[in-house]
């Protein structure tokens, strides 16, 4: 990966391909009233944030007190929660997306056209046959450049199995979860490879598709202003993706590109 890489927003005319041209849309969804309220409230001092110690609370059937907002955990970590709706989407489509988009900057830009700049995987497994969608991203690292709020960030996101943080398959099945995307996060410029942040996107089936309950757990001392930035960013990219993922999935799966 070139540390002096040049990046830009959007997909330029000569960068489009057969996948990205039909689905790239610069326009992004407005924030919902619930998300605006969560941002305006600011740091929730009336409750504690979720971290790995109480992550299994997500397995409870009811919603938790904090589904949209941010709070400090007992150990000082900053915990950020966002819930998004995915109508007509299956958990299998979301697993497919994480294995499919990881190989290409242009595919990554479909997700949040006004914030995503660059993506490169540690391993390009797109031509490896016999892999499941989950095997295409679990164990892999995605190096991404993106705006989070006004901050231009260069991140390393390393995906791992949910069982590594206590979310075993049987428990997830019993709680009606179809998949959980888990990763550790750090700076792609950190040559030591230190990754102290965590992200969890828990995808639960609903009668109309599924819902994603996202949690970001960031180290003690993380500035509180990252709370509103990440709520805005995550809600926008996930809601934008939910708007076209079923069509993209069908297009890629059923079109003969030979």
What are these regions (language model features)?
Residues 65-72, 83, 162-169, 200-204:
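Short amphipathic beta-strand and strand-loop transition segments with alternating hydrophobic
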Residues 116-192:
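Glycine-rich portal/gate segments that line the openings of hydrophobic small-molecule binding cavities
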